[in-house]
């Protein structure tokens, strides 16, 4: 019985760790979080970016990720994001950002549009990653943490 209980505790702990960075919304006013891989011809089906010549820089539109979300307000808020490198078990790798990123470590989300003629007012935010100002240098698992008002502890969504 003790053995079964200890196995269940270990499995539960590992599930909680792996779910720590699952794609999701963490704020009650944020809705419709979408992440998709796009190119000029539409949405791609592959769930990964390709490391070419030791870098992912966003210069190839077919190797970028588009993230969008809605916030239930007509007040344009200041959202930003940062990127965190993770191990294969989705735990933080411990690498410093300069070891896996070239350029800035955070970016503001300044592409937004207010809803028009809708019963519920909302603001749609979107951005693409990577881009010229933030490029990936190493392969691995990553999570993009979207936060509000420059406060990296105030995460509203993660992809």
Place the predicted regions along the sequence by residue.
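Bacterial Sec-dependent N-terminal signal peptides
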Residues: 1-24
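Sec-dependent signal peptide cleavage junction
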Residues: 18-41
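Hydrophobic or amphipathic alpha-helical targeting/insertion segments
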Residues: 20, 138-139, 152-154
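Short beta-strand elements
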Residues: 29-34, 44-50, 152-159
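Contiguous beta-strand segments within globular domains
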Residues: 35-85, 124
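Extended low-complexity, serine/threonine- and proline-enriched intrinsically disordered segments
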Residues: 75-104
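Extended, compositionally simple fibrous regions characteristic of intermediate-filament-like scaffolds
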Residues: 98-108, 112-123
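Ligand-binding face of N-terminal immunoglobulin V-set domains in extracellular IgSF glycoproteins
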Residues: 113, 119-149
């Amino acid at each position: 019985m003790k053995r079964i209980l200890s196995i269940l505790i270990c499995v539960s702990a590992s599930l909680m760790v792996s779910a720590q960075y699952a794609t999701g919304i963490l704020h009650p006013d944020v809705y419709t979080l979408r992440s998709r891989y796009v190119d000029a011809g539409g949405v791609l089906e592959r769930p990964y970016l390709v490391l070419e010549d030791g870098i992912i820089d966003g210069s190839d539109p077919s190797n970028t990720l588009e993230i969008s979300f809605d916030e239930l307000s007509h007040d344009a808020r200041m959202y930003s994001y940062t990127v965190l490198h993770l191990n294969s078990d989705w735990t933080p790798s411990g690498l410093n950002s300069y070891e896996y990123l070239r350029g800035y470590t955070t970016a503001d989300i300044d592409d937004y549009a207010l809803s028009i003629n809708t019963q519920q007012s909302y603001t749609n935010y979107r951005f693409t990653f990577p881009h010229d100002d933030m490029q990936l240098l190493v392969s691995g698992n990553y999570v993009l943490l979207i936060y509000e008002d420059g406060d990296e502890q105030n995460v509203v969504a993660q992809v």
